Amino acid sequence: MQILKSVSELLEFRNNCGGSVGFVPTMGALHNGHATLIKNSVSQNDDTIVSVFVNPTQFLPGEDLEKYPRNQSGDIKICELCGASALFFPNADEIYSKDEPLIIAPKRISTILEGATRPGHFDGVCMVLNKLFNLVSPTRAYFGKKDSQQLVIVQNMVKRFFLNLEIVPCDIVRESDGLALSSRNSYLNDDELCYALKLSRSLMRASNLIKANELNSNIIKSSMSECLEPLKVDYIAVVDRNFEPIENVEIGNSIILVAAYVGKTRLIDNIWI
């Protein structure tokens, strides 16, 4: 596996790729969820490029940019074990200039839920991914369903900008107890890890209600809210795959999402119905 630390090194590597190229963009602190994305890419492409870049434009003032977990040696090891061809560590000064053109995410979907709590976040996501897609020129790019709102926004960007790549959604990876894997889980102490399970358990309750033919969104959200106590809940939402709110769950076309604070750490989770 090659370690690439500049745009010129990346472009040279990419020019020598003869077949399909899979791309896994990350912010590092890689875990088994990322490993699944990388393995999926390795199995479906001739070469796989992973990027690690803690993108400053998607963090708001006061968010955890400086505290965001970083583990370069661990990231390298995971990428090697998963069979990645190259690992790209961009430099922010190369990625961004002082006179940066703006890319604005679609207003409706980028200003609700995650976008309401983190205004401008998805603009930063679109900005960096547009640059990385142009640099890597991947055949396919891999994204986890855990960040489902981001996934839908990226799919929209690829379509609207006529980018020649396939976005491959990958299922959420969970611990054996149901906790969705997240780099931010490293912030949690043992007691908080127990409370964090309330997110996945609230979604399991929603799933069980749906299996019992309860499809009313308000009833499902109310039951989830009870399950989440005493956490500080940011939102509970039932939407279709275009992130339009729906009054009743539509089997095969719905996402149920939750965001809540466990201590000072904000966690998200969802299930696709």
Curated annotation (Swiss-Prot):
Name its cellular compartments. Cytoplasm
Q: Which SUPFAM superfamilies match?
A: Nucleotidylyl transferase (SSF52374)
Q: In which pathway does it act?
A: Cofactor biosynthesis; (R)-pantothenate biosynthesis; (R)-pantothenate from (R)-pantoate and beta-alanine: step 1/1
Q: Which GO terms describe its cellular component?
A: cytosol
Q: What is its EC number?
A: 6.3.2.1
**Keywords, comma-separated and alphabetical:** ATP-binding, Cytoplasm, Ligase, Nucleotide-binding, Pantothenate biosynthesis
A GO molecular function annotation here is:
ATP binding
Q: Which reaction does it catalyse?
A: (R)-pantoate + beta-alanine + ATP = (R)-pantothenate + AMP + diphosphate + H(+)
**TM segment ranges:** none
For this protein, the record's InterPro entries field holds: Cyt_trans-like, Pantoate_ligase, Pantoate_ligase_C, Rossmann-like_a/b/a_fold
Give any Pfam family that matches: Pantoate_ligase
Residues at the active site: 34
What are its GO biological-process terms? Answer: pantothenate biosynthetic process
The EC category is ligase
Q: Which family does it belong to?
A: Belongs to the pantothenate synthetase family.
Which HAMAP family does the record match to this protein?
PanC
More details: The reaction proceeds by a bi uni uni bi ping pong mechanism.
Supply the name of the protein: Pantothenate synthetase
